[in-house]
């Protein structure tokens, strides 16, 4: 298989009107990745393949989304909507380059797996000329039926055209197919539009190929592989299936999910073995959690690295650029953004650390914030090793706190603090004996006077 060339035609020109959205359908996301990018990822999982993207509405945006993850692709605009075969032929220029295999896939089927497409390509390598990907739903009503004679596929019959006997067939058309490259254009050009809608249907190439004595066959894949997305309900269903797959994959790889159904991953989440994830945790894009870490409930992460044996949460938020070293702690109601926290440092409660470096073994007290933004620009806070930042401190960047320095609680620090120094940045306390009693009597009298006038 590795020496066979392949062109994958990704049909992504559908209007998607049932999505009720200004966004092209294929750019809606599952697990933080556009539908069409899931499909391209699966295609690339079969081995080296050139990509021909057939686009319509939002063509530039669709192409940009695909290339962000897949690298350069060829894009072809389908200017008229005249059926699936017509859509494939929009990429005629690419097909004419000549390939061993032609994969035809749909940009709105994000759950298709690489192994399913690989299986279709393997059939081509074994001698098939056309391979249709089929499935067996619990209820086949509404789907085109795959009509077989022995191990050969002879036709695809749509539900409305099927006889009662054919409607009993449970093997249905998944829409995706693989075609031997040398026959692709001849088969596609032979498709006519003699039907009620006057459209050119890709499914017709099955009967055409069979009539020419070609080897046409079908393979069966799991039902979820061919689920197409047409509305927001189906989008949510696809998300649920994807998450279920990912949770299983994570647990089989050595990650403990205490309540799997409450944990949500992104398409690129990387979690190493022996990590424990408590209930109700969300992983956004670009998160890597190293071995032995503990993620407590209600934590939200994106664009973050969590080091070995680190502890996060509960109710912690890690934003892009958070880089937490080994055995660090980011506790409840803490937010870390664009900051490196070195080994053993603790940020336990009610704290914001942004655009900062926290040295090894330092302790950040409750309520501490780095004041990193003046409304126009961001500035950096550097905290040395083994520093102690007292509770309710404000560190006004740019500022540096030296190794082993102490910051008194309640301080506002605007100047650099040398190593081993103790810094205060607050008003001196004054205590007035008996004043509280006088104030209580005064305020009670005011309240009583207001009540009497009502």
Swiss-Prot record:
Quickly give the catalysed reaction.
alpha-D-glucosamine 1-phosphate + acetyl-CoA = N-acetyl-alpha-D-glucosamine 1-phosphate + CoA + H(+); N-acetyl-alpha-D-glucosamine 1-phosphate + UTP + H(+) = UDP-N-acetyl-alpha-D-glucosamine + diphosphate
Could you name the Gene Ontology cellular component terms for this entry?
cytoplasm; membrane
Q: Explain how, and how many, cofactor molecules are bound.
A: Binds 1 Mg(2+) ion per subunit.
Enzyme class label: transferase
Annotated active site residues, numbered on this chain, are 349 (proton acceptor)
The metabolic or biological pathway listed in the UniProt record of this protein is: Nucleotide-sugar biosynthesis; UDP-N-acetyl-alpha-D-glucosamine biosynthesis; N-acetyl-alpha-D-glucosamine 1-phosphate from alpha-D-glucosamine 6-phosphate (route II): step 2/2; Nucleotide-sugar biosynthesis; UDP-N-acetyl-alpha-D-glucosamine biosynthesis; UDP-N-acetyl-alpha-D-glucosamine from N-acetyl-alpha-D-glucosamine 1-phosphate: step 1/1; Bacterial outer membrane biogenesis; LPS lipid A biosynthesis
Q: Which residue ranges does the record annotate as region Linker?
A: 233-253
| PANTHER family for the chain | BIFUNCTIONAL PROTEIN GLMU, NUCLEOTIDYL TRANSFERASE
Identify the InterPro entries for this entry. Bifunctional_GlmU (IPR005882), GlmU-like (IPR050065), GlmU_C_LbH (IPR038009), Hexapep (IPR001451), Hexapep_transf_CS (IPR018357), MobA-like_NTP_Trfase (IPR025877), Nucleotide-diphossugar_trans (IPR029044), Trimer_LpxA-like_sf (IPR011004)
Q: Main role?
A: Catalyzes the last two sequential reactions in the de novo biosynthetic pathway for UDP-N-acetylglucosamine (UDP-GlcNAc). The C-terminal domain catalyzes the transfer of acetyl group from acetyl coenzyme A to glucosamine-1-phosphate (GlcN-1-P) to produce N-acetylglucosamine-1-phosphate (GlcNAc-1-P), which is converted into UDP-GlcNAc by the transfer of uridine 5-monophosphate (from uridine 5-triphosphate), a reaction catalyzed by the N-terminal domain.
The coding gene here is glmU
What is the protein name for this chain?
Bifunctional protein GlmU
Report residue spans for region: N-acetyltransferase. 254-454
């Amino acid at each position: 298989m590795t020496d066979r060339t392949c062109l994958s035609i990704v049909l992504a020109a559908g209007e998607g009107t049932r999505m009720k959205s200004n966004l092209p359908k294929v750019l809606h996301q599952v697990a933080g990745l556009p539908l069409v990018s899931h499909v391209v990822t699966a295609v690339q999982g079969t081995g080296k393949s050139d990509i021909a993207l057939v686009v319509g509405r939002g063509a530039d945006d669709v192409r940009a989304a695909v290339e962000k993850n897949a690298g350069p692709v060829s894009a072809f605009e389908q200017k008229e909507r005249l059926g699936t075969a017509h859509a494939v032929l929009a990429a005629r220029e690419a097909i004419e380059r000549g390939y061993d295999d032609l994969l035809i896939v749909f940009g709105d089927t994000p759950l298709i797996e690489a192994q399913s497409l690989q299986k279709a390509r393997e059939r081509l390598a074994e001698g098939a000329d056309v391979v249709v990907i089929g499935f067996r739903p619990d209820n086949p009503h509404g789907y085109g039926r795959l009509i077989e004679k022995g191990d050969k596929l002879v036709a695809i019959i749509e539900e409305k055209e099927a006889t009662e006997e054919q409607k009993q067939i449970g093997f249905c058309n998944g829409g995706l197919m693989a075609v031997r490259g040398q026959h692709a254009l001849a088969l596609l050009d032979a498709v006519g539009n003699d039907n009620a809608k006057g459209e050119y249907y890709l499914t017709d190439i099955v009967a055409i190929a069979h009539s020419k004595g070609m080897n046409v066959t079908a393979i069966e894949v799991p039902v979820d592989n061919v689920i197409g997305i047409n509305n927001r309900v189906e989008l949510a269903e696809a998300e649920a299936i994807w998450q279920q797959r990912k949770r299983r994959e994570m647990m089989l790889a050595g990650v403990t999910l205490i309540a799997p159904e409450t944990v949500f991953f992104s398409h690129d989440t990387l979690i190493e073995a022996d990590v424990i994830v408590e209930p109700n945790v969300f992983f956004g894009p670009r998160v890597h959690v190293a071995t032995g870490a503990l993620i407590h409930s209600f934590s939200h992460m994106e664009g973050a690295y969590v080091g070995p044996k680190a502890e996060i949460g509960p109710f912690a938020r890690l934003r892009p650029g958070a880089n937490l070293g080994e055995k660090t702690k980011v506790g409840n109601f803490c937010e870390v953004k664009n900051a490196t926290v070195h080994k053993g440092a603790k940020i336990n409660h009610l704290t914001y650390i942004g655009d900062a470096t926290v040295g090894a073994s330092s302790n950040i007290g409750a309520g501490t914030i780095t004041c990193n933004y003046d409304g126009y620009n961001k500035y950096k806070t550097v905290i040395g090793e083994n520093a102690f930042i007292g509770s309710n401190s404000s560190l006004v960047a740019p500022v540096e706190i030296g190794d082993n320095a102490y910051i008194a609680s309640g301080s506002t620090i605007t100047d650099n603090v040398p190593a081993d120094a103790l810094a205060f940045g607050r008003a001196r306390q004054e205590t007035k004996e008996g004043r509280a009693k006088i104030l209580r009597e005064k305020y009670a009298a005011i309240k009583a006077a207001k009540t009497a006038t009502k």
